[in-house]
């Protein structure tokens, strides 16, 4: 009964974290992230209701660079749209944190989760607590002289969310899944290595994806597989190792493509390793990986070719999390055996 309760709690928490990540991506893609220019952790749980309240929020927004440089002349109705998207993202983050923290306290004091098992839950708790500060730290970077948030802070904000999800999902499968029943002579060395490498490169790719979004790097070089008939674009060919390139959307898009190829190759090798073991569970994971990898690559290419359509770009981000989840599941099963 207690195990089932923890499973349901972790499952809901994981779904909420994914939803918050996806809504956060949509908020960025629609340029809504700077519409709320204050951070009120407690009083900010309610949106404006009256016409006067909306006018007040709109007036605050007009005092910052994004209105004057990007959205000058937008109507109150247009402002309400971007405001409510950012509001929903923040509210979802608060609700997700509460859904995680309140039951965790209950489980701890009821000794449902033993002290020896508490460390990952505490780490996730600390990350939840600082994630709001990181989000505001990111937003503040776009409220100064430039109407754009720091792409590094944006990527950091996303990666913290992914780490939270990783911890919760790992605890979920640890609590829910049975280990593999395989003869001891089965060699797990290669699939274990490649599942670990796959997790690493997917993390790197998610981070780079956030940099692409932060610099609007998906709006240039909308061709595939080459960039303006070249593998390495002219802008970065002669100064490839210059650190300033990390502020250049051309370079960021190129690196995102490059790591994308790496993700594809590593996951394909992992799939081959899993199929060679000939175990039903691992074969099922291999088939899932084939489908999700295909969807991830396809949505990424479509996102690029069509200059970042919001729905496809959001699906692309979602499949990155699904791909990571399946690889984590694979890693757990192999390691537990």
UniProtKB/Swiss-Prot annotation:
Catalytic function, reaction form: Fe(II)-heme o + 2 A + H2O = Fe(II)-heme a + 2 AH2
Disulfide bonds: none
Binding site for heme: 256, 316
E.C. designation(s): 1.17.99.9
Family, as annotated: Belongs to the COX15/CtaA family. Type 2 subfamily.
Role this protein plays: Catalyzes the conversion of heme O to heme A by two successive hydroxylations of the methyl group at C8. The first hydroxylation forms heme I, the second hydroxylation results in an unstable dihydroxymethyl group, which spontaneously dehydrates, resulting in the formyl group of heme A.
Name of this chain's protein: Heme A synthase
């Amino acid at each position: 009964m207690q195990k089932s309760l923890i499973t349901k709690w972790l499952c809901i928490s994981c779904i909420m974290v994914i939803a918050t990540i996806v809504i956060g991506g949509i908020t960025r893609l629609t340029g809504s992230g700077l519409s709320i220019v204050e951070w009120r952790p407690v009083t900010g749980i309610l949106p404006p209701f009256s016409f006067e309240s909306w006018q007040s929020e709109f007036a605050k927004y007009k005092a910052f660079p994004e209105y004057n440089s990007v959205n000058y002349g937008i109507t109150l109705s247009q402002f309400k749209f971007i405001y409510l998207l950012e509001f929903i993202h923040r509210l979802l983050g608060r609700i997700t944190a509460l859904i995680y923290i309140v039951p965790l306290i209950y489980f701890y004091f009821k000794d449902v989760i033993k002290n020896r098992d508490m460390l990952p839950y505490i780490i996730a708790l600390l990350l939840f607590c600082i994630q709001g500060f990181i989000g505001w730290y990111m937003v503040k970077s776009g409220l100064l002289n430039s109407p754009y948030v720091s792409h590094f802070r944006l990527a950091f904000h996303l990666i913290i969310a992914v780490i939270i999800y990783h911890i919760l999902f790992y605890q979920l499968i640890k609590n829910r899944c049975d280990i593999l029943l395989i003869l001891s002579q089965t060699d797990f060395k290669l699939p274990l290595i490649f599942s670990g490498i796959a997790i690493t490169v997917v993390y790197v790719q998610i981070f780079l994806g956030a940099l692409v979004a932060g610099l609007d790097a998906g709006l240039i070089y909308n061709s595939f597989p080459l960039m303006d008939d070249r593998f390495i674009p002219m802008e970065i060919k002669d100064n490839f190792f210059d650190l300033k390139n990390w502020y250049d959307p051309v370079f960021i898009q190129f690196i995102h493509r490059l790591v994308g190829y790496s993700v594809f190759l590593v996951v394909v090798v992992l799939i081959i390793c899993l199929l060679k073991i000939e175990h039903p569970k691992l074969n099922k994971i291999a088939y899932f990986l084939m489908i999700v990898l295909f969807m991830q690559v396809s949505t990424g290419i479509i996102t690029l070719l069509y200059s970042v359509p919001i729905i496809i770009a959001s699906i692309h981000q979602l499949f990155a999390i699904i791909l990571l989840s399946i690889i984590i599941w694979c890693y757990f099963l192999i390691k537990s055996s």
